[in-house]
Design a protein with these regions (language model features):
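Hydrophobic, well-ordered secondary-structure elements that form the walls
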Residues: 10, 50, 111, 135, ...
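Residues that form or immediately flank small-molecule/cofactor binding pockets and catalytic motifs
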Residues: 69, 96, 116, 156-158
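A glycine-rich dinucleotide-binding beta-alpha-beta segment and adjacent secondary-structure elements
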Residues: 84-90, 145-207
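C-terminal substrate/ligand-recognition segments
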Residues: 140-144
């Protein structure tokens, strides 16, 4: 490793990762290994980015598609920690506001599907593409006719990416689950309580 002297350290990684990996346990009074291990972590997300060769001008910038069993789906995600066969989706079409974000005549999208974090044991290496295809079929049947044949670029993010690329424990998309004892003041603060000059700014929202 390399030792770097600094007056201020800014971490954009997840709070739990930052404290457990960058600050030795002897220097932590509040965010101990025991507390981090016992914390409850938020759901994760399956994110599909895609571009199309045609425009869908009747689709707004933001669309939420709520499935038929929303409450039960939340139980699947947070309590049972299973990947359900149905989903509720958020569809983002930025080209509705700025057409320059895609080539002329095309559209850009991403769609988010809430899924359980990695404690679920879901084999995302095997399940990612079938899950993407299920979302594709649903969008084609509800909002985006002819979607399959219109796609020109496609990329997915799974909970594995949240863990490995964004350094989020358990692949959680929103760090600690916002239960009462982990909400507001009880969440990690942007200015660390553990060490002067340690500023932890979490892109997925600590506060």
């Amino acid at each position: 490793g390399e030792r770097v002297a600094a007056d201020v350290v800014v971490s954009n990684a997840d709070a739990a990762w930052t404290y457990s990996r960058l600050l030795p346990s002897v220097a932590r009074r509040r965010w101990t290994d025991r507390k981090l291990d016992r914390a409850r972590y938020s759901m994760s997300l399956f994110v599909w980015y895609f571009g199309t060769r045609r425009r869908y001008d009747d689709v707004p910038h933001h669309t939420i598609l709520v499935g038929p069993r929303y409450r039960q789906l939340l139980d699947d995600i947070f309590e049972r920690k299973v990947l359900a066969s149905d989903f509720s989706l958020y569809l983002h079409r930025p080209t509705a506001s700025d057409p320059s974000l895609a080539p002329a005549g095309g559209d850009a999208f991403y769609v988010l599907s809430p899924v359980p974090h990695l404690d679920s044991g879901v084999d995302w290496a095997a399940r990612a593409e079938p899950y993407r295809q299920a979302i594709e079929r649903h969008l084609e049947a509800t909002l985006l006719p002819g979607l399959r044949d219109a796609i020109v670029t496609s990329r997915v993010m799974t909970p594995l990416d949240f863990r490995d690329r964004l350094l989020s424990p358990n692949g959680a998309a929103f760090s600690f689950e916002p239960v009462l004892t982990q909400s507001a003041w009880f969440r990690p603060h942007n200015r660390s309580e553990e060490l002067d000059g340690w500023i932890a700014r979490h892109a997925k929202g600590w506060t």
